[in-house]
A protein has these predicted regions:
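Conserved metal-phosphate-binding beta-hairpin within the catalytic cores
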Residues: 226
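Short, well-ordered surface patches within globular domains
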Residues: 132
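Sec/Tat signal peptide C-region and signal peptidase I cleavage site
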Residues: 27-32
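Segments that shape or occlude catalytic/ligand-binding pockets
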Residues: 129
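Bacterial N-terminal signal peptides
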Residues: 14-25
Length: 245
């Protein structure tokens, strides 16, 4: 087992070195993204666009804040820091979640409102480096691409203005049931999906109602994904978590 793991790590280091020779950013997230993509699809996927697009309409400076530092009762289940995601392997080096400050303030207000109904927010993802968005695009095709952003335009996650989340029960600490699972690439993920248990749909709709009352809109095909209203004003970023001040 140790010999196999050593071989995997040697291959990954070699892959990262190749990526650097091709001019790919050396940030931790970018290196991990390149390593995963090249192991699975071949080194050609790292060619072409090698940095986030520039948006001339993004007039606000980035002001990313860490969510758990605002309120420790906000729970984290950062799926991309582990293997429980649609890729089946970690793409983040750290289990952390950030948003632009106004978006974080809106999220905190939603969290406090939900507490009155006995629920809290559990975060699956917030700000996402652009390199990871490119990885997701490179690793998907067909119907799956309905659920990932095109790196040519960047995603609202890259701007620090999108959050993936669910609710947990304040009494039990358990995650509430929803009509579909997080990152599930099926129609059960649609915010208006009519199937599943009525209780699960009611909780999904409660989450949407509260989030939308605090400056967010739900993504049309993902019940868990909410975009902050001023996302257009922020730049597309490719900053590693460890570099956020």
């Amino acid at each position: 087992m140790l010999e196999c793991w050593g071989a995997v790590m040697r291959r990954r280091v070699k892959t990262i070195l190749i990526a650097l020779c091709l001019g790919v950013s050396a940030s931790p997230e970018r290196a991990v993204a390149v390593a995963i993509a090249t192991e699975s699809r071949g080194v050609a996927v790292v060619r072409g666009q090698d940095g986030p697009p520039k948006d001339p309409n993004a007039t606000r400076a980035a002001d990313l804040v860490e969510l758990v530092k605002l309120d420790p009762t906000i729970k984290l289940d950062i799926r991309y820091a582990g293997a429980n995601n649609f890729l089946g392997k970690p793409v983040y080096k750290e289990a952390r979640a950030f948003l632009q400050r106004p978006a974080a303030d809106g999220l905190l207000a939603a969290h406090k409102e939900l507490a009155k109904a006995g629920y809290g927010l559990m975060i699956h993802d917030g700000y996402r480096p652009w390199a990871i968005t490119k990885l997701f695009w490179d690793m998907t095709s067909g119907f799956q691409r309905e659920f990932v952003a095109d790196p040519k335009t960047g995603s609202k996650h890259n701007r620090g203005c999108a959050v993936d989340l669910t609710m947990y029960d304040l009494g039990t600490g358990q995650v509430v049931e929803m009509p579909g699972g997080y990152d599930e690439m099926s129609r059960r993920s649609y915010p208006d999906y009519p199937g599943g248990p009525p209780e699960a749909r009611a909780k999904r709709d409660l989450l949407r109602k509260v989030m939308e009352s605090h400056g967010f809109t739900v993504e049309p095909n993902e019940w868990w994904h909410f975009n902050y209203q001023d996302w257009r004003l922020y730049p597309i970023l490719d900053i590693a978590f460890g570099e956020i001040k």
